[in-house]
Amino acid sequence: MTLSESQERAARIKLLLMDCDGVLTDGRIWVLDEGGDQKTFHTRDGLGIELLHRAGLKSGIISGRTSDAVERRARGLGMSFVRQGCEEKRKAFAETLREADVTNAEVAFIGDDLNDIPLMLQSGLGVAVADAAPEVRERAHYVTNER
C-alpha cells in the first residue's frame, strides 16, 4: 500500500483501537511473587493518545489478558473503551464498533501478534508495530518505524 493510500484510510478514522501487550508496552510481563503482574507503559504513547483525543477521536483497548494496570492506564488516558480478557477479540471488536456508532472503515487497529490479524483486516486501517510478528507486519496497511 502506498503512503497516499494509507493517508486516505487514516483520514476516515474516528476510533483508534489497539491491543495492549506489545503495543502500549514492550510486551514483557513481570509476574510478581505475591501474585499479579506488572507492566511498563511509555509516556510518548500517552501523549499521542492525548493528542488523538484533542483532535476529536476516541480510543480503546481490546486485550486477551486482564490487568488492573491496563485498566488504570487506559482510564488515566481517557480511553472510551477498555475490553480485557477477550477470548474472542472479534466479538469485543464488533461490540465496541456498535457502542461507538462507527463503521469498520472508520476504525484503526494497532496490533503486534497473530491474534490481532483478524481485527486489523476488519479495520479501515490496520497498523502493526515495528517489532510485530512477521505475519502481522505482512498484513498491515501500515507498519510503524519504531516500537
Please place each PLM-identified region on the residue numbering.
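A positional/architectural concept
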Residues: L24-R54, S63
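Generic enzyme active-site microenvironment
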Residues: L17-D19, I110-G111
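Short coil/turn segments at beta-strand junctions that form active-site/ligand-binding loops
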Residues: R12-K14, L57, A105-E106
